[in-house]
Amino acid sequence: MIYVHVPFCRSRCLYCGFFSQCSKGPGRAWADEVCAEAQARKDEIAASAAVDTLYFGGGTPSVLPLEFIGRIADACGGRHYREWTVEVNPDDITPEYAAGLRSLGVNRVSMGVQSLDDGMLRWMNRRHSAEGAKRAFLMLRDAGFDNISVDIIFGVNGMSREMLEGTVKEILQWRPEHISAYQLSIEEGSALGRMAREGRYLELSDEDCSAQYYLICSLLAAAGYEHYEISNWALPGCRAVHNSAYWTRAPYVGLGPGAHSLGGPFSPDAFASLIPPTSLRSWAPPVHAATGGHGLRAEGPAQANYRSWNSEDLSGWTSEGELLTEAQIREEQIMLGLRTAGGIPESLCHPADLSCHPERSVAESKDLLTPSALPGHLRIPEEHWFVADDIIAGLI
């Protein structure tokens, strides 16, 4: 399971606080550095291979020449993955680029649409138009992509219910296999953050954001999409494999400036509960030379327990890391697991946490957690997912 961070964008979105640089794209030296890092970490990559995914995120990976994408994939071990995703901006897609991605072996594309209102797109400093987004989607379809994810944003002050509903309904006409919806957040270091500090932008109320979120839930449910994670919906059989593995804390290798990694023991059982393990390679807990032997097996089910993060230096790979405590691992399991419809094992809840006992009455538990479809698991019901952060905070 490999993540490649591409910290380059042609322009910066109003709300973006991620590490990235505005440019026409990276030079060959950057690609050389990522390939060198992949080679240096080949043992880690082999140890995380059970999930069998490669994900190019950013930033804007579609600023990369096709040659760079292919070279980096080769350095990671090849071009054949159960799921190989590249994030794209609609403005970067041409018939030739879409066909080139497909010919490399990329089998999933995640496209940032955000809105189909041209005025809202201009306010966000997005480079594409509503019509351009639709054209890009059709180009990807024509290139043979049968697994496309589309991102949208809600909770924007100035985005009316009608505007959001129009965006969702139009995207449903395209019938993408996967849809992600994210609430606008004010990030430190973003242009929007500066506007908010100066009083030039006021956040939409929680009540209005909640109404928009549940409008999306209703529209996608009626269209046959499965709501399998707080921000993610999929047609049957089209859940995001890579992201689902994150939510079960599967080990992954993050390549490139600013990328994070998680290493250590891993039991595929938890992952298989979210994604059928039809393509999982046989796996045994590795000895991680790259973590100084910190990939230690915890008591009970094996859990990855070493987190590292790369520097943001574009000229070479350096990283730092920490061995996670049992308490930190448990917190991550709860925070990530309760974002999903599958929830978390009941064993993660302390007996003193009355809210964690499904047998208690609705009044006593305040409807915080209910049994999920997975035996012995508890989840936050969809009607409370908008306030999931508050519920999770009460459990950790």
Regions found by a protein language model. Name each.
Residues H350-S361:
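Short amphipathic alpha-helical interaction segments
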Residues D367-L374:
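A short, conserved structural fragment
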Residues W385-I396:
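Short, amphipathic alpha-helical interaction segments positioned at domain boundaries
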Residues P7-F18:
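Local cysteine-cluster metal-coordination motifs and their immediate loop/turn environment
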Residues M1, S20-E44, A50-H288, G292-H350, ...:
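C-terminal scaffold of the Radical SAM
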Residues G376-I380:
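A generic structural motif
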